[in-house]
Regions:
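Juxtamembrane/interfacial segments around transmembrane helices
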Residues: 72-73, 111-113, 258-262
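Catalytic core of membrane glycerolipid acyltransferases/transacylases, capturing the structured
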Residues: 103-160, 187-188, 192-193
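Charged, low-complexity surface patches
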Residues: 31, 111, 137, 198, ...
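Non-catalytic C-terminal accessory region of glycerolipid acyltransferases
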Residues: 55-59, 97-101, 124-125, 160-285
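Membrane-anchoring hydrophobic helices of lipid-metabolizing enzymes
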Residues: 1-109, 145, 152
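Short, flexible loop segments at the rims of nucleotide/cofactor-binding pockets, characterized by
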Residues: 81-88, 133, 152-157, 194-196, ...
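Hydrophobic (often cysteine-bearing) scaffold residues that line and stabilize catalytic clefts
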Residues: 54, 136, 140, 247
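Short Gly/charged-rich anion-binding patches and loops
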Residues: 3, 37, 117, 143, ...
């Protein structure tokens, strides 16, 4: 299976990006699904910006989304040494190192660049317990799960058992990680504002914090626009007194901050606004 992913990503990241950019040009010219959905989402998120800005962002976003797919293939087929070399620098690492051993640490992320590459880097530093949405093809799902666990971390599917494992890990003072920007399953979220729209949002991270008082640190991969080099950035450390509340709204605001660092790095092709408090069934049609 590793050979299969290697054959799909035979070049270095730098050379692979050239190939990805060519594919992006074709996708944009054909106005493919990834382009259409990205345009809808960007028009919602940045409605206050002019059309020229939004169209430019759509094109750059599609290019970087396709690059992120290549990064994932690269991550699934290369040695740890090669993967470590793919990250230019880490900003605010001290936030990660200040883990509270009594209550653990919650790493909040979003689908910025390759989630697999990010998970690889943070699990290479420490044992992590994380959850993920399973891949429909069973053979691929098993390979990806094992690859995410190769550094000794624990990865579980997004279900009742996975949630239980996150709570258990925090109670043992461990680190847990979750990308919290996707639409959750029925009865697993609340409607909260995200880029000006009340959308269905997971309340798992607020629940984890409420029950364990674990501090929350955001983390994501970003790209440098001048050099194309990748770097990891840890955001603000969110700690709250017992009477304070970390809500889904607070979480969405933090995710917006991650995205706004470099909006083209975000995977805008996901239908994030499909489930809104004010229902709109035509939004992606």
């Amino acid at each position: 299976m590793r050979l299969f992913f290697y054959l799909l990503s035979p070049f270095s990241l730098r050379l692979g990006y050239v190939f990805c950019d060519f594919i992006a040009l074709i996708a944009i010219a054909l106005n493919t699904k990834i382009v259409k959905i990205s345009r809808i989402n960007i028009n919602i998120a940045y409605s206050s910006k002019n059309r020229e800005f939004r169209e430019s962002l759509v094109k750059r976003s599609v290019k970087h989304s396709i690059r992120s797919y290549y990064e994932t293939l690269f991550c699934l087929s290369r040695s740890q040494k090669k993967l470590n070399q793919s990250i230019f620098k880490v900003e605010n690492r001290f936030l990660y190192s200040q883990t509270n051993k009594d209550s653990g640490l919650i790493l909040l992320s979003a689908h910025n660049r390759s989630v697999d590459l990010l998970l690889n880097q943070i699990t290479n530093q420490n044992d992590i317990t994380a959850i993920f949405k399973p891949i429909k093809i069973k053979a691929f799902n098993e390979f990806v799960r094992k690859n995410r666990q190769k550094t000794g971390s624990n990865v579980f599917e997004t279900n009742f058992r996975g949630v239980k494992e996150l709570f258990s890990a925090l109670k043992r003072g461990k680190v847990v990680a979750m990308a919290a920007d996707q639409v959750p399953a029925k009865n697993m979220g609340v409607y909260e504002e995200f880029f000006g729209r009340k959308v269905y949002t997971t309340n798992l991270i607020p629940s984890l914090h409420s029950k364990t008082k674990a501090p929350i640190v955001s983390v994501a991969i970003h790209s440098d626009n001048l050099t194309n080099q990748l770097y990891i950035r840890y955001g603000c450390k969110s700690t709250f007194q017992e009477k304070s509340q970390y809500s889904a709204k607070t979480m969405n605001q933090e995710i917006e901050k991650i995205i706004n660092i470099n909006p083209e790095d975000y995977n805008w092709e996901y239908k994030r606004f499909k489930k809104q408090e004010v229902e709109d069934n035509t939004i992606y049609k």
